[in-house]
Amino acid sequence: KKNSILKKNQSWINATQNNFKVDDYESLIPNADLVINLTPDKQHHNVIKTLQKLMKKNSCLGYSHGFNIVEFGETIRKDITVIMVAPKCPGTEVREEYKRGFGVPTLIAVHDKNDIHQQGLDIAKAWSFSIGAHHAGVLESSFVAEVKSDLMGEQTILCGMLQTASLLCYDKLIQNKCDPAYASKLIQHGWETITESLKHGGITLMMDRLSNSXKIRAYKISEKIKKILSPLFQKHMDDIISGEFSSEMMKDWSNNDKKLLDCRRKIKNTSFEQSPIYKEKIPEQEYYDHGILMIAILKSGIELSFEKMITAGIIEESAYYESLHELPLIANTISRKKLYEMNKVI
């Protein structure tokens, strides 16, 4: 936006300090072969409306999430190739992984109604390579599969479960007379520590960090949780497949994000978010030994999310990325600034 450039706001500072060329729509878009739209979903329609008027013939439009195409139903000019490169984590984590010479698991797709020159897949591959995604894994998906699996993952295991479980586990520890500062650190940094094992060996390696007795206990708790939460996960999946969830979310957009902002305020004022800082170091294995319930919650949530997505017809690649592989990257955001950070960047 022109006023952002004139005011030299934080986005302008970030871009210029990292050697990106900064200018307004009218100056940059008409000459671009590839235009990548990384704005929030809520802004997509107005942004795309402006872009289409300025994009040159036979250029390419890139998305990092397909909500605007699938749920809103945006129509793009036929001469424009439309692709998607969807890293399975918040944008902040994409940048951090790239800076350390790696990348994040990524889904790529081509809009079947906008690939007139049959170049979309090659462009998507090149884009994913440029952000380091090939180091972690790039899988071809579809716009529909990416959107439905993304929404399901975020509402259940990735964000919904991590948030609810953090509050639940903290309150339970306090009830059991645990030091509030220790309880807070165990949970805040426990998710990141425990889910790191998922990167290297999935649920099996995570469970193997426990003693035999603790492993059996975690398994039994996990099975109980799955029975309790299965109907809730199924309702989430049904609402996402039918479009009901997206419809309600877009209504909230029209109401100035009232529900979203109310939820953020409530979370920010919870005892967990306001808890004191624990300054002592917690050994890595202690997070596992004292986090059996957390491990059981992760196991049940991953399995339930994956199973519900597969049953709904979502391809395994998308279901896997959105139930297990993205989880450590979401946990990283909690480790930095608890739940408020996660809520802000997702």
Curated annotation (Swiss-Prot):
Please give the Pfam families that the UniProt record associates with this protein. KARI_C, KARI_N
Keyword list (alphabetical) reads: Amino-acid biosynthesis, Branched-chain amino acid biosynthesis, Magnesium, Metal-binding, NADP, Oxidoreductase, Repeat
**Segments traversing the membrane:** none
Q: Organism, per UniProt?
A: Buchnera aphidicola subsp. Uroleucon rurale
Task: Kindly state one GO CC term assigned in the UniProt record.
Answer: cytosol
GO-annotated biological processes = isoleucine biosynthetic process; L-valine biosynthetic process
Family, as annotated: Belongs to the ketol-acid reductoisomerase family.
Q: What is the name of this protein?
A: Ketol-acid reductoisomerase (NADP(+))
Report residues binding Mg(2+) 1: D150, E154
Q: Which EC number(s) are documented for this chain?
A: 1.1.1.86
Q: In which pathway does it act?
A: Amino-acid biosynthesis; L-isoleucine biosynthesis; L-isoleucine from 2-oxobutanoate: step 2/4; Amino-acid biosynthesis; L-valine biosynthesis; L-valine from pyruvate: step 2/4
Keyword Metal-binding listed:
yes
Report the residue ranges that make up the KARI C-terminal knotted domain in this protein. Answer: 142-286, 287-346
Give a yes or no for keyword S-adenosyl-L-methionine in this entry: no
